[in-house]
Amino acid sequence: GALTAVMVRPVDTAVEFGELLGDKRYGTCIIGPGAGVGERTCDLVHTALGAQRHLVLDADALTSFAARPERLFESIKSSGDKAVVLTPHEGEFPRLFSDLSNKFPGRSKLERVRTAAERCGAVVLLKGPDTTIAAPDGRATIAANAPPWLATAGAGDVLSGIIAGLLAQGVPAFEAASIGVWMHGEAAREAGPGLIAEDLTETLPAVHRRIYDALGVEY
């Protein structure tokens, strides 16, 4: 089958990606889900950062830098003032921040994420039942609204998409990550137990309606 509502332009190399980003309308990128682990993915990330695009990095985009995470951090810090959000889970987090793993006692999750954000120069969102978000300037928040049935394959990819959508609308990185996590959890609550990732996109409109109603905004 085919999903004809989605427009697709294949990009196989960093050079092709750079050509695509020559169009300034592409202001925000997600790299990682399904990208594959390796230098090609690293090159795509460096290309997006070099083009100074807002960027959400997840999954393979994080693991690809496991051998030399400082390469990623240096690239982020040299990319100007564009928003960058890293969205690891506890398995991916130590691939970039090995000394901040939860295997080492004595540091809270909040402290670990704050340290990671300061080190890499990006907003870091460490997923889990108590998803923790921190900015390089020390701001941090913990989201506690995620139901247990949100732990399902592909749910993190949906979260990356929500955050990228907010970044594309001009929402700053820390706020986009915080709002995105809350909306993600609420969409899971709307869907109920037994959800699959695709259900989250179906229930997001109900979350939007609740927000609009609370704010008294017509839609």
Residue spans of the language-model regions?
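Short, small-residue alpha-helix embedded
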Residues: R95-S98, T152-M183
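Glycine-rich phosphate/pyrophosphate-binding beta-alpha loops
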Residues: P148-L150
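Alpha-helical transmembrane segments in multi-pass membrane proteins
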Residues: T28, G32-G34, T152, S160, ...
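Amphipathic alpha-helical interaction elements
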Residues: S101-N102, A168, R189-G192
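Glycine-rich phosphate/dinucleotide-binding loop and adjoining beta-alpha-beta core of small-molecule
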Residues: G1-A144, Y212-Y219
